[in-house]
């Protein structure tokens, strides 16, 4: 009688390990995407759950999708980072100058009022 209960316990244990193992394996693309700060990490996580119901057909594509994005390079193999000698756009330079002038003007007009009742 003991062996019957032991075998039942082993069966339940094996079933739970396989069940949670499959779920853990399907979270690998999400963990990769999360580690790389992937912009579609939530979509990859949802698609991983959908993959459980589609007999794991889309799971390899999720792995590829998660590993394609690299934070320093973006999506492809070419570099999307602007060169160090960035050409300044005249409109951006004008806006930057305007912001600095407005900040200086605001700092000059700013008066520190420590009174409790300024209207008196």
UniProtKB/Swiss-Prot annotation:
Pfam families: DUF3302
One GO location term (cellular component): plasma membrane
Family: To E.coli YiaW.
Protein's name according to its UniProt entry: Uncharacterized protein YibI
Record lineage: Bacteria, Pseudomonadati, Pseudomonadota, Gammaproteobacteria, Enterobacterales
Gene name of the encoded protein: yibI
């Amino acid at each position: 009688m003991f062996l019957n209960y032991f075998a039942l316990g082993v069966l339940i244990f094996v079933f739970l390990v396989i069940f949670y193992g499959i779920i853990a394996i399907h979270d690998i693309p999400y963990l990769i995407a999360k580690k790389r700060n992937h912009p579609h990490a939530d979509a990859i996580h949802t698609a991983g759950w959908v993959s459980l119901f589609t007999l794991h057909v889309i799971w390899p594509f999720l792995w590829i999708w998660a590993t394609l994005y690299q934070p320093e390079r973006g999506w492809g193999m070419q570099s999307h980072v602007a060169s160090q000698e960035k050409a300044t756009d005249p409109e951006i330079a004008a806006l930057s100058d305007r912001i600095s002038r407005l900040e200086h003007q605001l700092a000059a007009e700013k008066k520190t009022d420590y009174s409790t009742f300024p209207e008196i």
